[in-house]
Design a protein with these regions (language model features):
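ATP-binding N-terminal substructure of ATP-dependent carboxylate-amine bond-forming enzymes
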Residues: 1-124, 141, 155-159
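Active-site nucleotide/adenylate-binding loops and adjacent lid/helix of ATP-dependent enzymes
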Residues: 128-201
């Protein structure tokens, strides 16, 4: 599962932090977290990524291990169990760069918490804070102004007729974690819709 050829010369090391960060992801966010720990504590974080990226692949401040299909639940759990076994009994902190990884951590919190410190809220609260349709009600309760929002299910085209909005619209997936796994031509994080035809498309 792990591609040892992608490891830099030195292994991960907790340094003065007293805890080893295990970071999931291969983007600038993963590098930034590793750099912050390195600058503050001399830590060499362990970064698990699905591929070797130029941002983390050759960095001397972290150890990068490639785990193919890391975002797949069984692979995710097996990889983290192997890391925990390898580093036991050292304290580990699990950090994620990607909503889908945060959600996987939250869904398996009880299992992972036996080996990792998890700095994320429980799943129920995570859903309230990150699901856009539920977050809207929280804003209303707190009196926080936000753009007028309505939830539309593409599987129910007739539902659009009752929405209290008019074009042009900005559309986003209600769950960015779930949307990560969706694959279709023209996929974007945000859609700008000038009319109904753009929505149907």
């Amino acid at each position: 599962m792990n591609d040892n050829r992608t490891r830099p010369h030195a292994a991960a090391d907790a340094g003065a932090a007293g805890v080893l960060p295990v970071i999931l992801g291969g983007d600038i966010g993963a590098y930034s977290l590793a750099r912050a720990f390195n600058e503050a504590y001399g830590t060499r974080s362990l970064v698990l990524s699905q591929s070797r990226t130029h941002l983390i692949g050759g960095s001397s401040i972290l150890e990068n291990r490639v785990v193919e299909r890391l975002e797949s639940e069984p692979v995710f759990l097996a990889a983290l169990a192997a890391v925990a076994e390898e580093h036991a009994p050292a304290p580990l902190m699990l950090l994620a760069c990607g909503d889908w990884y945060v959600r996987l951590i939250a869904e398996h919190r009880d299992e992972l918490a036996a080996s990792y410190a998890i700095p994320y809220v429980p799943l129920e609260l995570l859903d309230r804070l990150t699901q856009k349709d539920r977050f809207l009600s929280l804003c209303a309760e707190a009196g926080v102004p936000c753009p007028r929002t309505a939830v539309y299910d593409p599987a129910d085209p007739a539902g659009l007729d009752g929405l209290p909005l008019t074009f042009p619209l900005v559309a986003k997936a209600a769950s960015s974690a779930d949307y990560h796994y969706a694959q279709f031509p023209g996929k974007r994080k945000v859609f700008f819709l000038d009319d109904r035809a753009a929505l149907d498309e």
